[in-house]
Amino acid sequence: NEDKVQHILVQELPHSPESFIHLDMVFTFLDKDKCMVYEPLIMSPGNYQTVHIKIQHGKLISIRREKTLLHALKKLGMDLEPVYCGGEDETWNMEREQWHSGANFFCVAPGKVLGYARNNYTVEAMNNAGFEIIRANDVISNKVDLSKYEKYMITIEGSELPRGGGGARCMTMPINRDAVEW
């Protein structure tokens, strides 16, 4: 519908290191009301710009700077609670786990995500946010019935995948799934 206003949010990222190659390395949706964030970049206004662009009838309506990406999303009706990559306490843990794709989750459905087991502080933050932590090997061997859990994180073992330059979302081909109603 051409009458509908299109909203484009642009999040500036650092040019280096390569762990900031795209948005999924610092921000991913986990559920309808939760997202994984790399706090030093996503939650710190001023360091990197967030821009909100509005387009209608193929024409630019406005461009404005927003305080943060989460602030801009909230204005659009997506009030998201952040879960912090690397936990909330130590910047070193945040940096280390972001470098190891700790903010990069593959969301199969709202509240059902896959991510790396090696990011211990991130896994703990997910558990504290209400996600059941389930090992991928337990799913593969049918030791776990996923239908019994409302929210879960399936943890993927290994250190070789992050060396390939991405996380669970980066390394997943597109899938067909039902649209999420916000």
Please name every model-derived segment:
Residues 1-182:
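The feature marks the mature, well-folded catalytic cores of soluble enzymes
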